[in-house]
């Protein structure tokens, strides 16, 4: 495979345990590996900050896997706290335990169904530009969700390594050394996937210029959705969103207090011959919903009418 990369990209990954935080990164050409550690035995937070200042000053980017919702918010905590204490003239104190607590909160937020945007930092507040391969390939979609380990298998990696210790374990010095090795391994595998993703990243770079909005971390479908909405808004301002006094915007939604009749959403040309399909079709036409998320999940037998008798049918 021909190796193509963008100048100024750093591939990175973080690991966090109660007594150790590690951040590993390598330049997009595969050279210049760096590993920073914050633990009971070593605290390289100032070295990490010095390096990040150079990355920021050079206009470079950090490329990760699920970094927008985890790795970067954790780094952002370090960067913003550093700025705050510097402004106040105080000494910077950051421990692995502090970062671990932040990390666990970030993970919890990722599984919060009521928190649509998780822990992502607002674009205008991001200090160092991010490229997230996880989002670009739409792996945040439940139907497409894929782990880095699965990608390692698909990329025919010689070594597929999983997290060496259970989450929350207090590590010994020897175990910390193993964790640092694992952290570097994940960065190498992310780098490999970055090479596979070159054309997708280039496309988003070109489209961002063409359409006038940053779609670096957008999936293919989100690019289309955003472009469509922008075109509608250009044709008639306020068609899709209502602007707030504070500069934000709220999506316009049609209120349906009496629910949505599914039969009104089904095309008339839908016809089925098999009895089990007819049963499903008939059942859907009888449904009225007031929510759209999870309403047809975990249904009991008495709730699905004639469909139940076909549930275990072999075809």
Identify the function of each model-found stretch:
Residues 32-150:
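Conserved DEDDh/DEDDy metal-dependent 3′-5′ exonuclease domain
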Residues 26-28, 77-82, 207-208:
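Short secondary-structure boundary/capping segments
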Residues 7, 24, 28-29, 35:
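Generic N-terminal leader segments that precede the first folded domain
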Residues 1-7, 52-56, 303-315:
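A short acidic-Thr-Gly-centered motif at the start of a beta-strand
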Residues 6-16, 132, 315:
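Two-metal-ion RNase H-like nuclease active-site motif
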Residues 18-23:
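Short N-terminal binding/cap micro-motifs at the start of the first secondary-structure element
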Residues 146, 154-162, 168-315:
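Conserved "right-hand" nucleotidyltransferase catalytic core of DNA-directed polymerases
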Residues 9, 70, 185:
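Short, well-structured alpha-helical interface segments that form or flank functional binding sites
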């Amino acid at each position: 495979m021909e190796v193509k990369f963008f100048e100024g990209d750093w591939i990175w990954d973080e690991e966090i345990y109660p007594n150790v935080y590690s951040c590993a990164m390598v330049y997009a050409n595969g050279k210049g590996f760096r590993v920073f550690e914050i633990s009971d035995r070593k605290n390289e937070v100032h070295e990490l900050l010095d390096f990040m200042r150079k990355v920021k000053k050079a206009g470079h980017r950090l490329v990760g896997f699920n970094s927008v919702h985890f790795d970067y918010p954790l780094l952002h905590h370090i960067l913003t706290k550093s700025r705050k204490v510097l402004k106040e003239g105080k000494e910077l104190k950051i421990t692995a335990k502090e970062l671990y607590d932040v990390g666990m909160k970030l993970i919890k937020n990722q599984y919060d169904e009521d928190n649509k945007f998780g822990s992502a930092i607002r674009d205008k507040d991001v200090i160092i530009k991010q490229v997230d391969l996880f989002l670009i390939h739409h792996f945040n979609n439940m139907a497409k969700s894929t782990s880095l380990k699965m990608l390692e298998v698909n990329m025919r990696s010689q070594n597929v390594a999983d997290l060496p210790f259970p989450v929350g374990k207090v590590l010994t010095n020897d175990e910390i050394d193993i964790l640092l090795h694992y952290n570097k391994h994940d960065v190498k595998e992310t780098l490999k996937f970055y090479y596979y993703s070159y054309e997708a990243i280039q496309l988003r770079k070109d489209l961002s210029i063409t359409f006038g909005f940053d779609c670096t971390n957008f999936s293919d479908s989100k690019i289309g959705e955003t472009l469509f909405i922008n075109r509608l808004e250009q044709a008639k301002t306020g068609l899709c969103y209502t602007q707030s006094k504070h500069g934000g915007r709220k999506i316009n939604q049609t209120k349906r207090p009496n629910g949505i009749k599914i039969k009104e959403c089904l095309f008339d040309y839908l016809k089925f011959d098999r009895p089990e399909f007819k049963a499903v079709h008939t059942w859907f036409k009888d449904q009225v919903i007031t929510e759209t998320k999870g309403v047809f999940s975990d249904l009991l037998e008495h709730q699905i009418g004639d469909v139940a008798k076909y549930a275990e049918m072999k075809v």
